[in-house]
């Protein structure tokens, strides 16, 4: 991602922090995770975020082999709707997203197209949803299927 996407990165970081989801960052990033604009985009959630960095996509896939993990690849080319997966009994779920401009690498999609690709249904008017919106939609579907386990049910900011 280049610098014009710092708000997208901040939104993704905030979604991960507020849902207790680990954020895996795969290098090369195209940005520094300590730059002021990234922290500003992540608001006050950046220090509450669990981050794991990987030197490359290959290193990530070696550490977390898709065949041995509950791993899905989010893409507009996906064979399965993200809501058709039963996440409810999965302890750990990995959802990989590609670059905002290009998506996931073609070789990866070809390898896992029939088994592990998921998509968000949308009208064919535009290329895709904003990346941070996609992350939020799929993350909350996983949480919904798990009955929002460990999530706060009622706001703590008002007396009920």
Where are these regions (language model features)?
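Post-transcriptional modification and biogenesis factors for structured RNAs
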Residues: 1-160
């Amino acid at each position: 991602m280049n610098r014009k996407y710092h708000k997208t990165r901040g939104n993704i970081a905030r979604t991960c922090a507020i849902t207790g989801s680990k954020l895996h960052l795969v290098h090369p990033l195209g940005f520094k995770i300590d730059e002021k604009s990234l922290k500003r985009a992540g608001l006050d959630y950046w220090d509450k975020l669990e981050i794991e960095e990987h030197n490359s996509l290959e290193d990530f896939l070696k550490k977390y082999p898709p065949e041995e993990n509950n791993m899905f690849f989010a893409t507009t080319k996906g064979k399965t709707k993200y809501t058709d997966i039963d996440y409810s009994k999965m302890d750990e779920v990995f959802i990989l997203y590609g670059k905002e401009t290009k998506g996931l690498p073609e070789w990866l999609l070809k390898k896992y197209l029939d088994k592990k690709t998921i998509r968000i249904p949308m009208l064919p008017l535009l290329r895709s949803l904003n990346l941070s919106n996609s992350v939020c939609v799929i993350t909350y579907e996983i949480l919904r299927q798990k009955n929002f386990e460990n999530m706060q049910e009622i706001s703590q900011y008002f007396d009920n």
